[in-house]
Each structure stands twice: as structure tokens, then as C-alpha cells.
A protein has these predicted regions:
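A bilobed periplasmic-binding-protein/Venus flytrap-type ligand-binding module shared by bacterial periplasmic
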Residues: 110-120, 216-230
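Short helix-initiation/N-cap motifs at beta->coil->alpha
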Residues: 35-36, 58-70, 164-175
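A ligand-binding cleft/hinge motif common to bilobed small-molecule-binding domains
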Residues: 80-95, 178-203
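Gram-negative bacterial Sec-dependent N-terminal signal peptides
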Residues: 1-23
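Extracytoplasmic "Venus flytrap"
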Residues: 26-43, 64
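A conserved helix-loop-strand patch within extracytoplasmic ligand-binding domains
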Residues: 96-143
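Ligand-binding cleft/hinge of the Venus flytrap
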Residues: 45-54, 131-164, 270
Length: 282
């Protein structure tokens, strides 16, 4: 083999190695586009992973069930929107042996039925006799945990005639936004953290039967291969956690006010270097 050919083969090998390394430096993260907290959390994490850890990040917007299926099969490397132990309890039970739980990125999360403070109803039980709601609950995407629990609540509270209207996170808040200034009664499926609590005066309907469960955590879940494939990312996800609903709310409100999620994340990361340092410290 002459020198020129040897150099050519060597160059090809270096290119192949570089390509392999580049491929190994990419991670995919699934999120639910209609969930304000999912969008905010995922984009901030992606910005840190890209800028501080040097990985390319591929974000994939999917439904909740597909999100869990993706991380369980390894088609997704991580998800940061796992509501546990109740909301995504069924998904966890089905997939817990196929994934790695890196712990909560948000504590004191809560789901349930939400109404404006101006309505008389204070409990889910009140919906049975309050005709002002016109036997309708405005929901989000079908198959999400809060929708499954709301279907159960309709049965458990004997809300005969009530219909759960599937929509999206944006569709739900749009209907709420139309009803609120008219002081109309409206019940929606909702959760904390969410920007709508900063925009309107709202309240959770009491849930004496405990259908929606108590406070939850939103966890970061990784595929079985993530720690081997991207150890720095796995280490980051173990430390990544919002301190309060106001902290994540800063990002959610920026997005709601018109900022693109990527830009809102960049702005937040640039504004809070001390928090990023806590998450990425070795």
C-alpha cells in the first residue's frame, strides 16, 4: 500500500470516527407541545445540554402515551414531563422496568378541575347541581393523565350527562380566556405549574373523593441506555430541578407573551448562570 493510499485510508477512518463521535453527541427528548410546563422545562434543559454540555438536542413533540413509549423503547433518550405517582401512574406501571427515573424536576405539582374564582362551585360535587356549567368540562389532549382522571371523576361523582371535551392545552386556555371576561361558568382540566394562574384568578375544585390524588412531582425519565450513551446528560438530569412555580413561570409567561420557546429558554439560561452552574457542577 503506497503512502498516498495509506493517508487516504487514515483520513477515511478519522472521518468515520468523527462522524461516530458526532452521532454519539446527540440526544433526543420528547415533550407534549400543548403543555406549557413541558415546553418550558424541555427547552430550558435542551439549552443547557447544548450550550454547557456540548450535545446536539433533538426535541420531539408527541402525545403523552407516545412519549412514554418512546423513552421505554429507546427511541427517545429522555422525557422531562412524567407526572408521578398519579397522573402518569398507568404509564409508569407499564414501563418502570424499561426506564431510569432521575428524580423530580418540579415538586408540588397538582392536577384537577379548575374554575374561575367568581363561580359559586367550590367542589367537584357542586357540578352535579350547578346548571351554569352546561354539563361540560373543557379538557386537553385525549389520553393524557388528567383526562383519564377526569373521566373517572365524572363516574365517581355521578356527573350524569357531563361531557369531557377533548382539546389541547392551547385550546383549553383559549376557551377559558373567552369565558373569563364574560364571567361565564367554565370548568377545565388543569394543573400547576401553569401560566394561567398568573393571568386569571382561578381555583381548584375540591376533590373529597381523592380522584386526582394529592400533590405530585414532575420527573425526568431516561432510557436504559442514556447513562452509557450520554453520561454528562444523565448527571445533569439528576440535578436539574426548578425551585418554585415562579421560577418555571418566568419561562412559561415569556412563551405565552409571544417569545419562541427556544429564545425564552436562552434568555432564562443567560439570566440565571448560578442556577445553571448548580445543575452542571461535577
Amino acid at each position: 500500500m503506497n503512502m498516498r493510499r495509506m493517508l487516504g485510508v487514515g483520513s477515511a477512518l478519522l472521518l468515520a470516527m468523527s462522524a461516530g463521535q458526532a452521532m454519539a453527541k446527540e440526544v433526543s427528548i420528547g415533550y407534549v407541545d400543548g403543555w406549557a410546563d413541558s415546553v418550558a422545562t424541555t427547552n430550558v434543559a435542551a439549552e443547557v445540554i447544548k450550550e454547557k454540555l456540548g450535545y446536539d438536542v433533538k426535541l420531539q413533540a408527541v402525545a403523552a402515551g407516545i412519549m412514554w413509549q418512546g423513552v421505554a423503547t429507546g427511541k427517545l433518550d429522555a422525557i422531562l414531563s412524567a407526572w408521578l405517582p398519579v397522573t402518569h401512574g398507568e404509564y409508569w406501571a407499564k414501563n418502570k422496568d424499561k426506564v431510569v427515573d432521575f428524580g423530580p424536576n418540579f415538586k408540588d405539582a397538582k392536577i384537577g378541575l379548575i374554575v374561575p374564582e367568581y363561580v359559586k362551585a367550590n367542589s367537584i360535587e357542586d357540578l352535579k347541581t350547578d346548571t351554569s356549567f352546561k354539563q361540560k368540562i373543557v379538557g386537553i389532549d385525549a389520553g393524557s393523565g388528567v383526562m383519564i382522571k377526569t373521566e373517572q371523576a365524572i363516574k365517581d361523582y355521578d356527573l350524569t350527562g357531563y361531557k369531557l371535551q377533548a382539546s389541547s392545552g392551547a385550546g383549553m386556555t383559549a376557551e377559558l380566556g373567552r369565558a373569563y371576561p364574560k364571567q361565564q361558568s367554565i370548568a377545565v382540566t388543569g394543573w400547576v405549574p401553569h401560566w394561567m394562574f398568573a393571568k386569571w384568578k382561578l381555583k381548584f375544585l375540591e376533590d373529597p373523593k381523592g380522584v386526582f390524588g394529592a400533590a405530585e412531582t414532575v420527573n425526568s425519565i431516561g432510557s436504559k441506555d442514556l447513562e452509557k450513551k450520554a453520561p454528562e446528560v444523565a448527571a445533569f438530569l439528576k440535578k436539574f430541578q426548578w425551585q418554585s412555580k415562579d421560577e418555571i413561570g418566568e419561562v412559561m409567561l415569556a412563551i405565552q407573551d409571544g417569545a419562541k420557546p427556544e429564545q425564552a429558554a436562552k434568555d432564562w439560561v443567560a439570566k440565571h448562570p448560578e442556577r445553571v452552574a448548580e445543575w452542571t457542577a461535577k
